[in-house]
Design a protein with these regions (language model features):
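Outer-membrane beta-barrel translocator/channel fold
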Residues: 86-126, 130-141
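Cleavable N-terminal export/targeting peptides
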Residues: 1-47, 281
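Short loop/turn motifs that connect adjacent beta-strands in outer-membrane beta-barrel proteins
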Residues: 46-52, 74-81, 92, 119-120, ...
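Transmembrane beta-strands of outer-membrane beta-barrel pores
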Residues: 60-64, 73, 87-93, 131-135, ...
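Outer-membrane beta-barrel transmembrane domain signature
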Residues: 151-238, 242-264, 277, 281
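Membrane-embedded beta-strand positions of outer-membrane beta-barrel proteins
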Residues: 56-58, 69, 83-87, 127, ...
Length: 281
């Protein structure tokens, strides 16, 4: 090949190289922009990484239950940080529901079961922040990922008076008997804590206009099992230990030395199981 032909071929070769470099740059810029937007961020080893996740929780613990919501940000493929809020009921460990087979003609009919000695229902509203770390990896879309979760924050405890339907016997001749709905007090303690005078519990909404407040804090730690750790949909379960601490004793049961009821406390420890469903995006 002559020198003239070789020299004349250089522009074509340079043009090919420039075109190839331009194509590579375009693909690189497009990929970088796509990753920066958090889309198609797929790693062969770590799975699909999203930016945010949200879900609902159903938690059962030793002495109560709660329902909640989580909203979080995915920091890394194995690390998420989130905010949470949950509302439920916290019971005294020695509570026992009882039932009397009593029925009356009229609007009341059969009476509801009751908890002997109960003074208040206690409903904690827990909020706070948490973190979830995965300790194991799984296949791209299948398998089980195991991790740990820990969270904590303030608690607003709501006390609702517990009402019983009590029997009142008149001192007049004929011993006329009436029934009344009453909450616990020092004055009616002998009747409130007398099995024979109790017909049953009043409706659950009774006392909602008499709520009291007990502030506190909450912390939880758990093992986390996720069947969709790197997928779009969240299906996970947790088992762990939770603690609630309040600024004063919570009067769930009526203190009574005669009956041996002196169990009110300000710190509650519970084992729990939590189920969570949600979505990542």
């Amino acid at each position: 090949m002559s020198n003239d032909k070789i020299i004349n071929a250089y522009p074509d070769i340079r043009l090919m190289y420039l075109s190839l470099i331009g194509m590579v740059l375009c693909v690189s810029l497009t990929a970088q922009q796509t990753l920066s937007l958090g889309r198609n961020n797929y790693n062969q080893d770590k799975g699909i990484i999203f930016q945010k996740e949200s879900g609902v929780n159903a938690r059962i613990y030793t002495n109560g239950f709660s329902f909640g919501y989580q909203l979080g940000k995915i920091k890394k493929y194995n690390l998420s940080q989130y905010y949470f809020a949950e509302f439920g009921e916290l019971k005294d460990p020695i509570e026992s529901r009882q039932q009397k087979n009593i029925s009356l003609s009229g609007p009341r009919g059969t009476f509801r079961g009751f908890i002997f000695g109960k003074q208040n229902n206690f409903y904690p509203l827990r909020v706070g922040v948490g973190e979830k770390r995965f300790l194991s990896e799984k296949g791209k879309r299948k398998g089980l990922a195991v991790g740990v979760s820990y969270e904590g924050g303030p608690t607003l405890g709501l006390l609702k008076p517990y009402y019983l339907i009590l029997r009142h016997t008149s001192d007049n001749p004929g011993n006329f008997t009436s029934i009344r709905s009453e909450r616990y007090s020092d004055e009616n303690a002998p009747r409130f804590l007398n099995w024979d005078d109790i017909f049953g519990a009043d409706k659950l909404t009774k006392g909602l206009d008499e709520l009291g407040i007990v502030p506190g804090i909450n912390i939880k730690g758990s093992l986390h099992f996720d069947w969709g750790a790197y997928g779009e949909f969240i299906r996970s379960a947790e088992i762990g230990l939770m603690a609630d601490a309040f600024i004063r004793d919570v009067p769930i049961l009526a203190d009574n030395d005669i009956l041996g009821i002196n169990n009110n406390q300000n710190i509650f420890l519970n084992f729990f199981v939590n189920l969570r469903l949600g979505k990542r995006k």
